[in-house]
Every structure is written in structure tokens, then in C-alpha cells.
């Protein structure tokens, strides 16, 4: 992959570079994904998650930008794995962009085949929000992480993580949310990363409090704050596959254990034990097969240590990076003895159509986001947990790139909020249109048996019709751009998922599209969980009037 040193930053203000606000939104969000404040390796078009890219290569990126600048408001741009392949006449209510990233026929859906295609320049890895142009930096996963640790606190520690120690690893674009999410819940956390730059970045953005290269210092500080029942987050430089076994050897057991290293990609995402970053990069280039094998062996040691901590009483869970699967394939037959975070903590929210709803101010003006915060505090005042989140986010979350906000809203709430935002754009309360989107990790948009759809009540973990139906209904209902991806979060062969974005530009046409899309999109989450037999989803569907033909 050619590296290009250029600083990409989304335009701000109300001057259009394109022929309409929907096209402008797509252009700005693509560029925002590659803003140095947002992207992990912008010179390689890598946004987050190992090699999750916004475009296939620089030639494709430039062609997408040119296409968006000339795209008419009754045309649709098609993007195939980060490359623009066609512009067709459609209509004004159709999506302006349709994206399909990293999709492979199941028999060939593995990393080896993907890498062959990638080397030939035929495919890219889109992760979830990298290739669908709606990544907003670490805030994008922060509330989900906050909710996860909050639910763990409610289930196991009396509602707060005060006086507890969490041990985790991985401080990249996704995992970087963990330190702040734990301290927001009152706890102490040691977060390990092998790359000093990742820790430095989280400290710079106020997601992590301190840095150390010493395990002794990390433990001393952690114990001191745990005793005082005060929160602190400690970024520890090192390899989790070395540090966790060492802690087991010393009989040190944290209260909570998880992991968000990029274990989904053994070649590009995980560093084997005994290698520096530089040595790992050299081996990766010279002998990728040996690298992958060493990586998998290290992951197995990592999971063995997590299981040992679980056996000693630590609340242990997989945070969706497929590390258990790798260890299982390497012969660790009890790798799945600790659960994934969705069945352990998040599924009830999915049953209510809740998920990581986000919005971005195309103006670039933080005041536009602060005004929308006030809408949440006013319109959803009865949801104290949500309002607390908004207040904390305002105080503690630093914007990356275009100002944005995330919060988990459910069926009915999303459409209500979208309507209000569109009205605020129409009457000039907000200085420019707002982009509304979400993660692919949502209630009805993903099939991922080792993550979002793990341990479904009816055994339908691997049924992948749901994300396809989600993308189809969002497209016909007028989402601004819609994406269908493979392999996000857990790697090739383990997930299919869909994304959508809708632009609130203040027009009446946008109001109608928003109403349709922000009803059907979370509605798919309710429907999917009704179909799987969840009582809470059935209650939600009946209460909200979701039309499900065979619901009992």
C-alpha cells in the first residue's frame, strides 16, 4: 500500500463543494474518516481496526472525491471495496452512495484469500465504520463500552466499579474507549498496549490518565486507587500475552478481565510475544505465515491466562475481537468458557431496538452539538442514565475531527430525535445540516456468531439474512448512504453487517426520509429479536406497534 503524506480534513461551514447537501455529507464524512485527529494511519487510508480502510488506495480515494463532487441529486454512486465502480441514474429519495466492502462467497471467506485479492488491488477491508464513512474517533464506541462496564457493575458489583480493578488490553481506535469507560463507572483500570503511540494518543485525548512501562508501578498505583475507591486509568506498555500469564503466576486476580487487542487479524492486528514493533513489522513482511502462527500461539497463551483468572473469580468476558475462536482453533478446547459481551451484558438493549446512534455537525461548530445535547436532556429527561451519559460526555469527551456525539437510543426515540434535529436545521437553530448514523454493531444490522449474535435463544447465531434485510429496507426508505460489509470486528468469515447514514438538511423531503429510515432501522432490531424468541422484544414490539405477521 502506497503511503501518501497529506493532511485530509473535512471542509467546514455552509459552502458546498458538491451539488447537494447529501453528497456534501458523504464527501465530508469520507474526509473526516481520514482526518489525522480521527484515523489511526491516515497515510495508508487506515481508519481503525488493524487495516480498516476508507478507500482501497489513493487512486480510488481521489476518484471517489471527484465522483462525489459531480454527483447529481438523482444519481447513485456505487463503491465496491473502496473503489468507485459506477454512477447510475436513480431518484432524489434513493441513497446517493451504496457501498459493499470486503464481501466474499462463504467458501472463500478467509484471510488468506482476502489477502491474495488485496495484493492484486481487488479488495480492501472496510471494518465497520471505516469503509462506510461514519467513524467519529474513539467516542464512537465509548458509550457502548460505558454501557457494557456499567451493566457488569450492576450485575456483579452493586452498580458501580468503585473499589474494583479491571485488566484489559488494546488501546487502538476501538479499545481506546476502555480506560475512560471504566473510570466513568468509578473503577480502576490497567490497559495494556504494545504500541506506545496508542497509549500516548489516548492520554492526549483524555481517554487515559497515565502511562507507565513498569508492571510494578501499574500495580502499585492501581492498588492505591482501588483502596481509596477512586478511579484512575493506567496505560501499561507491554504485551498482554506476557503480562497476563505473569499476573497469574504471581496469583494476582483483577475483578474484571477482558481484551480489545486487534486479535481479529493475526497478521496485521496482533504482535507475537518476544517481538518489538519493528521486529514484528520485519517478520510480517519476510514470513507472514510464520508471523500468523506465532501470533496465534500468543493469543492462545493470552486466553489461557484469562481463563485462569476467571477460575480464580475474575468476571471475564470476550470483547468481540474473536480471540476465543483463535485459541479454540489452536487446540484450547475450553476457550469459550467465558462469554462474549453481548450475551453477558448488551442483548436486553438490543431487544428494545437500542444501539449506538451518532450524529455529526457538518458545520464543524461544536455549538451545534451542544445544542443537540440540550435536546437529549430536554426530550429524554425521564431517562436519567442517558442524561448522565450526555453530561459526562460534554465534560470528558474531546471531539476528534468534526464535532459529534453518540448515545444509545431505541425504537421510536431515534425517529423522534431525527425529526427535532431536522427542524432545528430548517429554522436556523443549527448552522448547517447534521449527519445521523450508527455503528454496524447495532440491534438488527449484524450477524456475528462470536459477537453480536452469540448464543441467540433460538440458535440462529449464524443466520445472515438480517443484515441484508436491514440494508435493503434502509435503501428503499431513503437513507443517504447504505453499506454492506463482511468481517468487521471479528475478521474474515465470521460476520456480515450493514450500515446506514441519513442527512438532516432541514428539508421536508429529508423529514420524510428520516421518519422512515429511523423507524425501520431500529425496527429491524426489534424484529430480529422477536423472531429469536426474546420476551422483551415481543413486549417492545407490542408496545410500539411494530407489525410482525407471525408474532405470538
Curated annotation (Swiss-Prot):
Pfam families: Urocanase (PF01175), Urocanase_C (PF17392), Urocanase_N (PF17391). Binds 1 NAD(+) per subunit. Its cofactor is NAD(+). Keywords: Cytoplasm, Histidine metabolism, Lyase, NAD. It is an enzyme of class 4 (lyase). NAD(+) binds at residues 49-50, 127, 173-175, 193, 239-240, 260-264, 270-271, 319, 489. Pathway: Amino-acid degradation; L-histidine degradation into L-glutamate; N-formimidoyl-L-glutamate from L-histidine: step 2/3. GO terms for biological process: L-histidine catabolic process to glutamate and formamide; L-histidine catabolic process to glutamate and formate. Its EC number is 4.2.1.49. It comes from the Bacteria. GO terms for molecular function: urocanate hydratase activity. The active site is at 407. It is found in: Cytoplasm. The keyword Lyase applies. The keyword Lyase applies. GO terms for cellular component: cytoplasm. It catalyses: 4-imidazolone-5-propanoate = trans-urocanate + H2O. Belongs to the urocanase family. Catalyzes the conversion of urocanate to 4-imidazolone-5-propionate. This is Urocanate hydratase.
Amino acid at each position: 500500500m502506497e503511503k501518501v503524506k497529506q493532511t485530509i480534513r473535512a471542509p467546514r461551514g455552509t459552502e458546498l463543494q458538491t451539488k447537494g447537501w447529501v453528497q456534501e455529507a458523504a464527501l465530508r464524512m469520507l474526509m473526516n474518516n481520514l482526518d489525522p485527529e480521527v484515523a489511526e494511519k491516515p497515510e495508508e487510508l487506515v481508519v481503525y481496526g488493524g487495516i480498516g480502510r476508507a478507500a482501497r488506495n489513493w487512486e480510488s480515494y481521489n476518484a471517489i472525491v471527484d465522483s462525489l463532487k459531480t454527483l447529481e441529486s438523482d444519481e447513485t454512486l456505487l463503491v465496491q471495496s473502496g473503489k468507485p465502480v459506477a454512477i447510475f441514474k436513480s431518484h432524489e429519495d434513493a441513497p446517493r452512495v451504496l457501498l459493499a466492502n470486503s464481501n466474499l462467497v462463504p467458501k472463500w471467506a478467509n484471510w488468506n484469500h482476502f489477502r491474495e485479492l488485496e495484493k492484486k488491488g481487488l479488495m480492501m477491508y472496510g471494518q465497520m465504520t471505516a469503509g462506510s464513512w461514519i467513524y467519529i474517533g474513539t467516542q464512537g464506541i465509548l458509550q457502548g463500552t460505558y454501557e457494557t462496564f456499567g451493566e457488569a457493575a450492576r450485575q456483579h458489583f452493586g452498580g458501580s466499579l468503585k473499589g474494583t480493578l479491571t485488566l484489559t488490553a488494546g488501546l487502538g481506535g476501538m479499545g481506546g474507549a476502555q480506560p475512560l469507560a471504566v473510570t466513568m463507572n468509578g473503577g480502576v483500570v490497567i490497559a495494556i498496549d504494545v504500541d506506545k503511540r496508542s497509549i500516548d494518543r489516548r492520554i492526549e485525548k483524555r481517554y487515559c490518565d497515565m502511562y507507565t512501562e513498569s508492571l510494578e508501578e501499574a500495580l502499585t498505583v492501581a492498588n492505591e486507587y482501588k483502596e481509596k475507591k477512586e478511579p484512575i486509568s493506567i496505560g501499561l506498555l507491554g504485551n498482554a500475552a506476557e503480562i497476563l500469564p505473569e499476573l497469574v503466576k504471581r496469583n494476582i486476580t483483577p475483578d474484571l478481565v477482558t481484551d480489545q487487542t486487534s486479535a481479529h487479524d493475526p497478521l496485521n492486528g496482533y504482535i507475537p510475544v518476544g517481538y518489538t514493533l519493528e521486529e514484528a513489522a520485519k517478520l510480517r513482511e519476510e514470513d507472514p505465515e510464520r508471523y500468523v502462527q506465532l501470533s496465534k500461539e500468543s493469543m492462545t497463551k493470552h486466553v489461557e491466562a484469562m481463563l485462569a483468572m476467571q477460575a480464580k473469580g475474575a468476571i471475564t468476558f470476550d470483547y468481540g475481537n474473536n480471540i476465543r475462536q483463535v485459541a479454540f482453533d489452536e487446540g484450547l478446547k475450553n476457550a469459550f468458557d467465558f462469554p462474549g459481551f453481548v450475551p453477558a451484558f448488551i442483548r436486553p438493549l438490543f431487544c428494545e431496538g437500542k444501539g449506538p446512534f451518532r450524529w455529526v455537525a457538518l458545520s464543524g461548530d461544536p455549538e451545534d452539538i451542544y445544542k443537540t445535547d440540550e435536546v437529549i436532556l430536554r426530550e429524554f429527561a425521564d431517562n436519567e442514565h442517558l442524561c448522565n451519559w450526555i453530561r459526562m460526555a460534554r465534560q470528558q469527551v474531546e471531539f476528534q475531527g468534526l464535532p459529534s456525539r453518540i448515545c444509545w437510543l431505541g425504537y421510536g426515540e431515534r425517529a423522534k430525535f431525527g425529526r427535532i434535529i431536522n427542524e432545528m436545521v430548517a429554522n436556523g437553530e443549527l448552522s448547517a445540516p447534521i449527519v445521523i448514523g450508527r455503528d454496524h454493531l447495532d440491534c438488527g444490522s449484524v450477524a456475528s456468531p462470536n459477537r453480536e449474535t452469540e448464543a441467540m435463544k433460538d440458535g440462529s447465531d449464524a443466520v445472515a439474512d438480517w443484515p441484508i434485510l436491514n440494508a435493503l429496507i434502509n435503501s428503499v426508505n431513503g437513507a443517504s448512504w447504505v453499506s454492506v460489509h463482511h468481517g468487521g470486528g471479528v475478521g474474515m468469515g465470521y460476520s456480515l453487517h450493514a450500515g446506514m447514514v441519513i442527512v438532516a438538511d432541514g428539508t421536508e423531503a429529508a423529514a420524510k426520509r428520516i421518519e422512515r429510515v429511523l423507524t425501520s432501522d431500529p425496527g429491524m432490531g426489534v424484529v430480529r429479536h422477536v423472531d429469536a424468541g426474546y420476551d422483551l422484544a415481543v413486549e417492545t414490539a407490542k408496545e410500539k406497534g411494530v407489525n410482525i405477521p407471525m408474532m405470538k
